């Protein structure tokens, strides 16, 4: 991994000790307006790996600015030479002409090198910053993503990072150009007349307070604007992903209104920033005009006095006027530049807030890797409640060993899928313990735990790409034979072979081109390909027909040899052959045993079985079976 991507290398010590920050608005808990560019300064450590390119950009920019100002000096010298009668022949004029031509040639060369250096540097930096943000994001626990809108997260990694790229390739080079131009021109003017040079401090005295005044007002507007942009992305993401539902319910007008509301909010915040900017720019023009007028007036007076009285020559006056026009341009640019800096500061605040994220579920100090394949799972009096306070598990206990399978059933909300999430350490228990091979999973590394598991979620997710790529996601090095074998075990090979391009058929975003049952079977094939010691099936075949499910179950019975299997199901036929079946009601294991044992107990499980097999009317509770 590249050095620039390491979070540790870019977290400022000041931030580490500060208040918590969320990229959603990028503000500290106090809500104070930060100093201009405070977040943008955090880009500097990312430049370190590319310091040679950075140095080349600086030096070439300096060369370009010197070449840009040199013709003004030449014109002043030429003016004095002509007025004093020192030159009068064409070849002497040609010298100054060639000097000016050489200056413009040098300007073209140096400026080209500078542009290339800065724009390529911007690309390297935006890549490293984007990767740092993403690498920080993917370490966050599942709860983090459940609490946030996908569109807003995406806007940080895409739009906000792109805004920083624009800053790096445009605004930052403009700032450097302003500094170099102003300092070089100032040095030349001091050399000619320190009295006139002092006049240059007049605009600086007034511009700096104006910049601070503007930044404190516009920064909040741009921060709100970036958040509104994230909200637009979130609504659009929901609409596009759920377009089938939108159209099925004739909700196009309703959704257009929702998008319009968020877009209008973004528009209002952007206009608010524009209003502040339009108040700021005229002040810059006025100050620059005053400075130019003072230079012209004072310069004319000193020229009339002449060098003998401490004044300047006509040529020096010409140079002063030309220089002052060149120096006034940076002041005009500065007005627009401060606006761009504020936009970039708002984006940087969101990007670095994401980079600063710290997951709550991590490898504990001294955590050990699970070296041997998992062969025993134990839940010992496990309690768990979600952050909203909803208590889901109340003292759940069970054991699962190699070559065994366990089925988990119960009404919706009983805590079945929560057991799966705890096994994957998406969450941590509030009480009790979960162990794997006799070790508390909290004392094992996350990676070694998840390496043991092949997981099929009830919310099947397929990536945009081919069927082959989606199955091979579990093992990037798997060959075609292994992929096909996994698909056969999952009952997917038959429909894949009938697809237009077989295993190279594109499934679409989230597998939208496939049926629910087809998506489930590809997800199951993905888990099988991993050949995990622990197979977790969370409603893995709920969308397939009964015949296909029977085929899959037969195949899985062979695959389960030497493994542990946890199956969550509403369809009891799925887990009928499990060695152990847990019946959960309101987070409590009310029944535990094999299928025949639970039927004999004539309890909750027996009632569920009777309803599903048609032996009990689920609406009246009356028996429907008939003797004889």
Region spans (language model):
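Short cytosolic helices in intracellular loops of multi-pass membrane proteins
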Residues: 9, 15-19, 124-143, 149-158, ...
């Amino acid at each position: 991994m590249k050095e620039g991507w390491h979070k540790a290398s870019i977290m400022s010590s000041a931030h580490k000790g500060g208040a918590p920050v969320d990229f959603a608005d990028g503000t500290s808990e106090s809500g104070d307006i930060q100093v201009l560019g405070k977040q943008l300064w955090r880009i500097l450590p990312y430049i370190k790996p590319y310091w040679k390119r950075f140095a080349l950009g600086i030096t070439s920019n300096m060369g370009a600015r010197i070449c840009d100002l040199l013709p003004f000096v030449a014109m002043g010298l030429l003016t004095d030479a002509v007025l004093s009668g020192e030159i009068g022949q064409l070849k002497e004029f040609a010298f100054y002409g060639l000097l000016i031509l050489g200056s413009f040639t040098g300007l073209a060369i140096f400026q080209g090198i500078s542009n290339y250096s800065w724009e390529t540097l911007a690309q390297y930096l935006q890549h490293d910053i984007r990767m740092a943000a993403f690498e920080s994001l993917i370490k966050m626990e599942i709860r983090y993503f459940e609490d946030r809108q996908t569109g807003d997260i995406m806007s940080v990694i895409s739009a906000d990072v792109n805004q920083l790229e624009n800053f790096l390739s445009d605004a930052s080079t403009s700032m450097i150009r302003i500094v170099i131009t102003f300092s070089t021109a100032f040095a030349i003017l001091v050399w000619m007349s320190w009295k006139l040079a002092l006049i240059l401090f007049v605009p600086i005295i007034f511009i700096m307070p104006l910049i601070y005044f503007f930044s404190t007002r516009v920064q909040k507007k741009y921060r709100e604007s970036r958040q509104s942009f994230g909200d637009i992305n979130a609504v659009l993401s929901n609409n596009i992903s759920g377009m089938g539902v939108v159209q099925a319910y004739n909700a196009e007008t309703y959704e257009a209104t929702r998008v319009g509301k968020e877009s209008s909010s973004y528009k209002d915040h952007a206009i608010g920033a524009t209003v502040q900017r339009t108040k700021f720019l005229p002040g810059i023009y006025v100050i620059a005009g005053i400075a130019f007028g003072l230079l012209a007036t004072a310069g004319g007076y000193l020229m009339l006095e002449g060098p003998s009285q401490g004044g300047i020559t006509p040529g020096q006056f010409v140079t002063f006027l030309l220089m002052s026009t060149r120096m006034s341009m940076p002041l005009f640019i500065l007005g627009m530049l401060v606006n761009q800096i504020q936009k970039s500061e708002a984006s940087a605040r969101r990007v670095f807030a994401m980079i600063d994220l710290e997951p709550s579920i991590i490898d504990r100090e001294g955590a050990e890797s699970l070296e041997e394949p998992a062969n025993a799972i134990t839940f010992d009096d496990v309690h768990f409640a979600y952050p909203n306070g909803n208590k889901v598990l109340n003292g759940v206990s069970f054991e699962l060993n190699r070559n065994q399978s366990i089925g988990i059933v119960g009404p919706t909300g009983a805590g079945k899928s929560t057991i799966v999430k705890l096994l994957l350490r998406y969450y941590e228990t509030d009480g009790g313990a979960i162990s794997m091979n006799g070790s508390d999973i909290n004392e094992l590394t996350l990676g070694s735990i998840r390496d043991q598991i092949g997981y099929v979620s009830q919310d099947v997710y397929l990536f945009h790409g081919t069927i082959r790529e989606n199955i091979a996601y579990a093992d990037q090095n798997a060959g075609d034979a292994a992929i096909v074998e996994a698909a056969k075990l999952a009952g997917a090979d038959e429909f894949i072979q009938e697809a237009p391009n077989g295993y190279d058929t594109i499934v679409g975003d989230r597998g939208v081109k496939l049926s629910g049952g087809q998506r489930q079977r590809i997800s199951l094939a993905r888990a099988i390909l991993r050949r995990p010691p622990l197979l977790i099936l969370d409603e893995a075949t709920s969308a397939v027909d009964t015949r296909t499910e029977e085929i899959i179950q037969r195949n899985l019975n062979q695959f389960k040899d030497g493994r542990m299997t946890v199956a969550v199901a509403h369809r009891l036929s799925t887990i009928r052959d499990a060695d152990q079946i847990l019946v959960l009601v309101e987070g409590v294991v009310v029944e535990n045993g094999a299928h025949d044992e639970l039927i004999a107990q004539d309890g909750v499980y027996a009632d569920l079985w009777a309803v599903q097999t048609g032996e009990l009317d689920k609406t009246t509770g009356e028996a429907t079976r008939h003797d004889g």
